[in-house]
């Protein structure tokens, strides 16, 4: 495969990988070894399933941030028998030493921190093409880009006009990449779609895309919503963001968070973790919400619930965490105070209307940190160009909490690959007993000892002694 060089890295291009620097592999391996000690769930799955290889025959196209923690996930999938190809799901989220460690270990990986949008879609195509002419039969997705590429490409095979009117820069490059592929192979996407046995989706944004396809009757294969496993959403989204948000803001700006006025837009699990993160360092935190239940939760936690437009000229730090688009628009951006910090911890870059800032003066301070001069003369500090700040400006969530999420991913891949015929073309969640198993696998590492129910106690509350302990409708 041939690729152009990313602006920020000299690429090493080999037959079946594209990374920044293979010389970083040893560094990546050392960090990977440390991460393994903090990821007991994945290591337990290797011990439990490594001999039986339940994923033997699985060809997994992985589109998920190429980090050290993801490297542990990849090697777990391989240990369980899978054949894997990998790309990052964000142009800024790759850790180049992690990608190098994977390439050195023989994993076809296509990921460079700071890759262009054109390269991003080239790399996503690369995970769909096996060297022997084969195709993936499973997708492991984060944000839905790999799944969406297959689906949109299939539509374009029937009606190329679906690619006529891109609505933003991202779509411009996506549509161009599909046209380029179809010019070479007019049935590429439909062949892949026909072979996919199932998709497992990591995050809120991608799950929303899957449910939209299910509702319209367009979902062509079963999917597991990993995001809404309790041991994902209530841990990764909440506790992961609680640690990684302020880590990224401080790495990027070196500002003192204490004493600052901060606005978190969105108070779902990600917003809750983000608000705790900022409050924990002494910021005065306000919340903007559309959902009355989430707004009331925020108020009960002592946050002021406000409208963005009412406080936009007062805040020092803005964080979007909604999964929606055009949440902070130009009408808000131009009113911000001097040196306000603006960032996003949702999935895509369109929560903040970054496109509307392109006509202003930009001064790049360092990678993923830009000073933008507004018409008022005030300057704002935009982090990661509005993309995921915790992966663009730092290294994402800690290994331990990602072990929860990725243990769910592996179990979901096993479930759909080995029992796919038992599932319809719908979106599912993992059963409660597996959710509890994921939690159980992580307790010993942090010194927890579970109390055990007696048979009489279990009978009294009508649950098995060994669990599950809560009904599916229980809200943790």
From Swiss-Prot:
<keyword id="KW-0963">Cytoplasm</keyword>
<comment type="similarity">
    <text>Belongs to the adenosylhomocysteinase family.</text>
</comment>
<dbReference type="InterPro" id="IPR015878">
    <property type="entry name" value="Ado_hCys_hydrolase_NAD-bd"/>
</dbReference>
<dbReference type="InterPro" id="IPR000043">
    <property type="entry name" value="Adenosylhomocysteinase-like"/>
</dbReference>
<dbReference type="InterPro" id="IPR042172">
    <property type="entry name" value="Adenosylhomocyst_ase-like_sf"/>
</dbReference>
<dbReference type="GO" id="GO:0071269">
    <property type="term" value="P:L-homocysteine biosynthetic process"/>
</dbReference>
<feature type="binding site">
    <location>
        <begin position="345"/>
        <end position="347"/>
    </location>
    <ligand>
        <name>NAD(+)</name>
    </ligand>
</feature>
<comment type="pathway">
    <text>Amino-acid biosynthesis; L-homocysteine biosynthesis; L-homocysteine from S-adenosyl-L-homocysteine: step 1/1.</text>
</comment>
<feature type="binding site">
    <location>
        <position position="237"/>
    </location>
    <ligand>
        <name>NAD(+)</name>
    </ligand>
</feature>
<feature type="binding site">
    <location>
        <begin position="203"/>
        <end position="205"/>
    </location>
    <ligand>
        <name>NAD(+)</name>
    </ligand>
</feature>
<keyword id="KW-0378">Hydrolase</keyword>
<protein>
    <recommendedName>
        <fullName>Adenosylhomocysteinase</fullName>
        <ecNumber>3.13.2.1</ecNumber>
    </recommendedName>
</protein>
<feature type="binding site">
    <location>
        <position position="390"/>
    </location>
    <ligand>
        <name>NAD(+)</name>
    </ligand>
</feature>
<dbReference type="Pfam" id="PF00670">
    <property type="entry name" value="AdoHcyase_NAD"/>
</dbReference>
<dbReference type="InterPro" id="IPR020082">
    <property type="entry name" value="S-Ado-L-homoCys_hydrolase_CS"/>
</dbReference>
<comment type="function">
    <text>May play a key role in the regulation of the intracellular concentration of adenosylhomocysteine.</text>
</comment>
<dbReference type="GO" id="GO:0006730">
    <property type="term" value="P:one-carbon metabolic process"/>
</dbReference>
<feature type="binding site">
    <location>
        <position position="289"/>
    </location>
    <ligand>
        <name>NAD(+)</name>
    </ligand>
</feature>
<feature type="binding site">
    <location>
        <position position="324"/>
    </location>
    <ligand>
        <name>NAD(+)</name>
    </ligand>
</feature>
<feature type="binding site">
    <location>
        <position position="142"/>
    </location>
    <ligand>
        <name>substrate</name>
    </ligand>
</feature>
<feature type="binding site">
    <location>
        <position position="236"/>
    </location>
    <ligand>
        <name>substrate</name>
    </ligand>
</feature>
<feature type="binding site">
    <location>
        <position position="202"/>
    </location>
    <ligand>
        <name>substrate</name>
    </ligand>
</feature>
<feature type="binding site">
    <location>
        <begin position="266"/>
        <end position="271"/>
    </location>
    <ligand>
        <name>NAD(+)</name>
    </ligand>
</feature>
<feature type="binding site">
    <location>
        <position position="67"/>
    </location>
    <ligand>
        <name>substrate</name>
    </ligand>
</feature>
<dbReference type="GO" id="GO:0004013">
    <property type="term" value="F:adenosylhomocysteinase activity"/>
</dbReference>
<feature type="binding site">
    <location>
        <position position="232"/>
    </location>
    <ligand>
        <name>substrate</name>
    </ligand>
</feature>
<keyword id="KW-0554">One-carbon metabolism</keyword>
<dbReference type="Pfam" id="PF05221">
    <property type="entry name" value="AdoHcyase"/>
</dbReference>
<keyword id="KW-0520">NAD</keyword>
<dbReference type="GO" id="GO:0005829">
    <property type="term" value="C:cytosol"/>
</dbReference>
<dbReference type="GO" id="GO:0033353">
    <property type="term" value="P:S-adenosylmethionine cycle"/>
</dbReference>
<dbReference type="InterPro" id="IPR036291">
    <property type="entry name" value="NAD(P)-bd_dom_sf"/>
</dbReference>
């Amino acid at each position: 495969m041939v690729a152009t060089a990313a602006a920020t890295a000299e690429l090493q291009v080999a037959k079946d990988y594209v990374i920044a620097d293979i010389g970083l592999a040893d560094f990546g391996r050392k960090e990977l070894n440390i991460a393994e000690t903090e990821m007991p769930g994945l290591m337990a799955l290797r011990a439990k399933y490594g001999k039986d290889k339940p994923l033997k025959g699985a060809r997994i196209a992985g589109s998920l941030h190429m980090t050290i923690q993801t490297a542990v996930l990849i090697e777990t999938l391989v240990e369980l028998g899978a054949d894997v190809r990998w790309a990052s799901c964000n142009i800024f989220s790759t850790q180049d030493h992690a990608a190098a460690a994977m390439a050195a270990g023989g994993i076809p990986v296509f990921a460079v921190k700071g890759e262009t949008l054109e390269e991003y879609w080239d790399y996503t195509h690369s995970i769909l093409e096996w060297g022997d002419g084969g195709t993936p039969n499973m997708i492991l997705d984060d944000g839905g880009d790999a799944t969406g590429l297959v689906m949109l490409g299939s539509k374009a095979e029937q009606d190329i006009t679906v690619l006529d009117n891109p609505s933003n820069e991202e779509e411009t490059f996506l549509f161009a990449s599909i046209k380029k592929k179809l010019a070479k192979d007019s049935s590429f996407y439909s062949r892949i779609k026909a072979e996919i046995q199932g998709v497992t989706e990591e995050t809120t944004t991608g799950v929303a895309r899957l449910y939209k396809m299910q509702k319209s009757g367009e979902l062509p294969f079963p999917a597991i919503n990993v995001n809404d496993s309790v041991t994902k959403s209530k841990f990764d989204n909440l506790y992961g963001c609680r640690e990684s948000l302020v880590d990224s803001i401080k790495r990027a700006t070196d500002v003192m968070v204490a004493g600052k006025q901060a606005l978190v837009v969105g108070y779902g699990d990600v917003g809750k973790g983000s608000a705790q993160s900022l409050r924990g360092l002494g910021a005065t935190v306000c919340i903007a919400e559309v959902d009355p239940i989430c707004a009331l939760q925020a108020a009960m936690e002592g946050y002021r619930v406000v409208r963005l437009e009412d406080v936009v000229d007062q805040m020092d730090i803005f964080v979007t965490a909604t999964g929606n688009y055009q949440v902070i628009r130009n009408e808000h951006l131009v009113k911000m105070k001097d040196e306000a910090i603006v960032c996003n911890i949702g999935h895509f870059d369109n929560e903040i209307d970054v496109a509307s800032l392109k006509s202003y003066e930009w001064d790049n301070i360092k990678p993923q940190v830009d000073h933008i001069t507004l018409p008022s003369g005030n300057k704002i500090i935009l982090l990661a160009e509005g993309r995921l700040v915790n992966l663009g400006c730092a290294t994402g969530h800690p290994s331990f909490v990602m072990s929860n999420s990725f243990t769910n991913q592996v179990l979901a891949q096993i479930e759909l690959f080995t029992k796919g015929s038992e599932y319809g073309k719908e979106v599912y969640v993992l059963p409660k007993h597996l959710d509890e198993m994921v939690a159980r696998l992580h307790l010993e590492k942090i010194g927890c000892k579970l109390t055990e129910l007696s048979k009489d106690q279990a009978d009294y509350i009508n649950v098995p002694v060994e669990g599950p302990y809560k009904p599916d409708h229980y809200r943790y």
